[in-house]
Swiss-Prot record:
This is Small ribosomal subunit protein uS15. One of its GO terms (molecular function) is structural constituent of ribosome. It comes from Rubrobacter xylanophilus (strain DSM 9941 / JCM 11954 / NBRC 16129 / PRD-1). Residues 1-25 are annotated as: Disordered. Keywords: Ribonucleoprotein, Ribosomal protein, RNA-binding, rRNA-binding. The gene is rpsO. SMART domains: Ribosomal_S15. The lineage of its organism: Bacteria, Bacillati, Actinomycetota, Rubrobacteria, Rubrobacterales. Part of the 30S ribosomal subunit. Forms a bridge to the 50S subunit in the 70S ribosome, contacting the 23S rRNA.
Length: 88
């Protein structure tokens, strides 16, 4: 149940309007939280290759969404990466 609450909290924090669940900002924020959680898991379980593959897929999806947002609206992109603390 905690995972659902964390996801809903992330959606509330990054949504662009009421009822927004699918904007690039929300999707990137959810992926970033999942990536951070999975990274912690992999620090403890170094040989969990199935989870590592899932992590790489999530990182790729986040990269594509960020690239899309950067092309579509640079200001929203810059705001998002600063709020999430991403290095780009």
């Amino acid at each position: 149940m905690a995972a659902v609450e964390n996801k809903e909290e992330t959606i509330r924090e990054f949504r662009t309007h009421e009822g927004d669940t699918g904007s690039p900002e929300v999707q990137v924020a959810i992926l970033t939280r999942r990536i951070a959680h999975l990274t912690e898991h992999l620090r403890e379980h170094k040989h969990d290759y199935h989870s590592r593959r899932g992590l790489l897929k999530m990182v790729g999806k986040r990269r594509r969404l960020l690239k899309y947002l950067q092309k579509k609206d640079v200001e929203r992109y810059r705001t998002l990466i600063s709020r999430l603390g991403l290095r780009r």
